[in-house]
Structure formats: C-alpha cells, structure tokens
C-alpha cells in the first residue's frame, strides 16, 4: 500500500499505481531487488520530468490479426505491457498464436513477470525480449571499452500447473539494476561484471555512472560473443 501511495502522490493515476506498486513489491519478494521498490524514486523523477506519461493510451500502429504493433506513448511500462499481453492472449485464443511489439515505452519492470502471467493466467508459452534502441547503452562488445548495446533481457515461460517454468536473464553479465543496488548499498560488485572507462576490470559500481562511464560486460565470460550476439539480435 505504501508503494501505491508514493506513486499516486507522485503523479501516477490511482489505477496505474495499483498495478505498478504491487509489481515492484513482488519483484523484491522474488529476490529481484534490481526491479523492486528501489525503482520508485526513479519513476517519480521520470513522472516529474515527463519521461513517464500518466494515463497514456496504447495505440495500435499495425494490425495483422495474429500480429500487433503498438505505441505506448511513454506510459508506465508495466501498465502498457500488461495491456498488450492481455490483447495478445485473446488473439492466441482466436488464431492459436500471436506476436506483438511495443515502442516508446518506459521501464517495464521485471520481464519474467509477463511470462508468469501468460503461463499462469492464460496457459500460454511465451518468449519475450526487450531492447532500448540505444537509449540506455551500457554494454561493450567483446574486446571493446565503449558501450554499444543495452542489457537487452530475454525471458521465456512455460505453464506447469500452479508454478510456471520461467527463464529470465539479461544478455549482459548482470542487469544494470543490480549494479545500482550495489551502489546504493555501498558494496562492491563481483568480478566479471564491469569495466571502467579505460577498459580495465573493476569491482566499483560507481564506475558505471561516472563521466566517462564504465561498461557492463556481455554475458558469457570468455565466450562473451554469445551474450553480445544475443543482445545484438534482440536490438535488431
């Protein structure tokens, strides 16, 4: 209730706060603090700056029955993606499968949550992925020192009785939010997560937010081309 209250008093519509607040709390309870209530101050600032638009419409920009492309007009990501998911689930009933895209969307929260909803509420198998089209470049290519891609997560879900099977991971060594959690806590990050602006390995989370900024390594360690390749294809 406190999360909902903070969002509502910060400019979110009551109906939106009632969706976004519990989603953030659930992420914390599931162990994903990077996508939990620590996001509330950032959301409130984005509302203030106009980077999140309360009560934005979800516009259909292309429709081919089993395919749907939408524009979120910078509404709350959790709200707009939830609307898209509900519509795609209805189309799956009609056509057997469906695919959808959403653009101009604010932070969507934990990607795996949508796969959980699709599996547990609709009985659907899902594959979901996110890119930022250069808006939040954090990840350097193997051998590079400048960021070129976002952390571009990938998630899959399969119905399994009361508890769906969910796979949810960033294509980088870590999600940006996990670095932020360490920074807020005043802790070091594990080795293998970050490079500083000179391309040297570092355990200091502050380097990712310095000027010039450091970068997050791609997923895969010595086989980092695999994580970067996945990220590149998601971006495309």
Show the residue positions of the predicted features:
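A generic, well-ordered mixed alpha/beta core segment in the N-terminal half of proteins
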Residues: 68-161
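Short, conserved micro-motifs enriched in small and acidic residues
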Residues: 14-15, 79-82, 224-231
